[in-house]
């Protein structure tokens, strides 16, 4: 059974891909919110054996627009009893456009959002909350219109637990 000769989604032109990306950016700006992306600046102290970063340092904050993809409730396990007692895990999923990330965040050091970086959401809880990126999904819209580079990133965030990290961004709310 052959495909339609009138629609060719994989040899599309750059203008169609740009239009699709423009629509994504515009919808995030209309329905989204302003937040801050805080990258981890301390790459030299990373433990290569265990893959963890014992001394995290967040010294810069980049204003970006995000879209809250699940606005009804927190995701994840929420409240449950573990071996350490009652744990409350609030997970949030947000969408950020690749173009706005590339325009505002220096591309020589950060090509994409990384796991372990922070996102500040100013309107949650009335005072704002910090969330840590647990997974940055860049394959959500896989090869839409034949484009390999993602149009947006879906970030899965978990509420940040402060443990002696250095946070000095210059933003008053953080």
Each language-model region and where it sits:
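Short acidic, S/G/P-rich loop/turn micro-motifs used as interaction or catalytic elements
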Residues: 101-102, 140
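Secondary-structure boundary elements
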Residues: 122-127, 165
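N-terminal disorder-to-order initiation segments that are Gly/Lys/Arg-biased
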Residues: 1-89, 93, 99-101, 148-174
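Short beta-strand-centered aromatic/proline hotspots
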Residues: 128-142
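Residues that form ligand- and interface-recognition hot spots within folded domains
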Residues: 98, 123, 135-137, 161
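Capsid-like jelly-roll
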Residues: 113-115, 140, 164-166
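Short coil-to-beta transition motif at edge beta-strands of beta-rich domains
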Residues: 106-124
């Amino acid at each position: 059974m052959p495909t339609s000769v009138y629609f060719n989604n994989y040899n599309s032109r750059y203008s169609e891909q740009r239009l699709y990306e423009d629509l994504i950016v515009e919808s995030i700006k209309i329905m989204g919110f302003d937040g801050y992306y805080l990258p981890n600046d301390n790459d030299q102290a990373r433990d290569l054996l265990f893959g963890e970063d014992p001394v995290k340092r967040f010294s810069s904050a980049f204003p970006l627009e995000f879209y809250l993809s699940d606005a009804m409730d927190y995701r994840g396990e929420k409240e449950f009893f573990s071996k350490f007692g009652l744990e409350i895990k609030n997970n949030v999923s947000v969408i950020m456009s690749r173009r706005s990330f590339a325009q505002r965040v220096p591309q020589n050091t950060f090509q994409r959002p990384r796991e372990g970086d922070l996102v500040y959401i100013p309107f949650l809880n009335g005072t704002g909350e910090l969330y840590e990126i647990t997974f940055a999904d860049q394959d959500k819209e896989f090869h839409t219109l034949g484009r390999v580079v993602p149009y947006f990133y879906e970030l899965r965030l978990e509420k940040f637990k402060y443990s002696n990290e250095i946070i000095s961004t210059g933003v008053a709310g953080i």
